[in-house]
Amino acid sequence: MKHLTGLCNCSAATIATLLELASDYKKELLKSNPQFQPTLCNKRIALVFFENSTRTRFSFELAARHLGASTLNFAAAASSVSKGETLSDTIKNLEAMQVDGFVLRHPSSGAANFITTITSRPVVNAGDGANEHPTQALLDLFTLQEHFGRLKGIRIIIIGDVLHSRVARSNIYGLLSVGAEVGLCSPVTLMPPDADQLGITMFTNLEDALAWADAAMVLRLQLERAAGGYLPSLEEYSVYYGLTDERLDRIQKNLLVLHPGPINREIEISNNVADRIQPPGYSKSMLLEQVTNGVAVRMAVLHTLLAENGK
């Protein structure tokens, strides 16, 4: 694997290898004084973020440091991009500084694939427009596998703005690749038109979707969707598609709850559900576990691309 720009063409075997390595890294991360082999010692990784990020950027930075690499943090607003420099020129200039790899977040779909055509360095897609966010999907798969002990055959319902979600797209590709069953639940205005061609079960009623699923992945609702005419109002969306205690308690099953963050509390998910770590009821929030797993998964990705490819 030279780059990780998406999961659309990522094999089940590749996913399994990355998750196995992530599992080893997580065991060490959870120790009071974790010690890692510095497999990326003297490597320089450019974190090129054209959009804001908390979890993804910081976890990539931690992942790189755990493996002995140094990071260059690029912020578009404080760079020559603000003076009109193109993405292509930015990447070429960083490569000329002998950067060993790129982690890119960009608002344009296809940006990560584009820069693989202009650099010989490994590229990791940290989210490009509405296209893909592969490391988020990998950490979601890792979280599910840790809990269920497998991925094949489990049912995951993805709830919310599937149409515009790069997280949903990468998860759909990854989950189908490993043999999981995928369901989508959203208003028809936020459902991708090609979903029925992928062998996906579609729902418009949230209660039916939750009853079908083993795990629920709640997507962040981009608040501008109401203003854009995709929704009558945020309040109505919350009434019909918000994940609440009452909805989870009615299905009376051990449902796992995931969310990629950031959260719009009391819109797509209630405070109680988001924070339900050890519940008295039937469901469990994995939101913070996902964040922990993100560091281990991104360590696995960086090691695979920069250490193994450099042998």
From Swiss-Prot:
Catalytic activity: carbamoyl phosphate + L-aspartate = N-carbamoyl-L-aspartate + phosphate + H(+)
Binding site for carbamoyl phosphate: R55, T56, R105, H133, Q136, G261, P262
Gene3D superfamilies, A to Z: Aspartate/ornithine carbamoyltransferase
InterPro entries according to UniProt: Asp/Orn_carbamoyltranf_P-bd, Asp/Orn_carbamoylTrfase, Asp/Orn_carbamoylTrfase_sf, Asp_carbamoyltransf, Asp_carbamoyltransf_Asp/Orn-bd
Binding site for L-aspartate: K83, R166, R220
Any single biological process term in GO: 'de novo' pyrimidine nucleobase biosynthetic process
EC number, as in UniProt: 2.1.3.2
GO cellular component: cytosol
Top-level EC class: transferase
SUPFAM superfamilies the record matches: Aspartate/ornithine carbamoyltransferase (SSF53671)
One function term, GO molecular function aspect: amino acid binding
Domain of life of the source: Bacteria
Keywords: Pyrimidine biosynthesis, Transferase
Pathway: Pyrimidine metabolism; UMP biosynthesis via de novo pathway; (S)-dihydroorotate from bicarbonate: step 2/3
UniProt record similarity statement: Belongs to the aspartate/ornithine carbamoyltransferase superfamily. ATCase family.
Function, as annotated: Catalyzes the condensation of carbamoyl phosphate and aspartate to form carbamoyl aspartate and inorganic phosphate, the committed step in the de novo pyrimidine nucleotide biosynthesis pathway.
Assembly and oligomerization: Heterododecamer (2C3:3R2) of six catalytic PyrB chains organized as two trimers (C3), and six regulatory PyrI chains organized as three dimers (R2).
Protein name: Aspartate carbamoyltransferase catalytic subunit
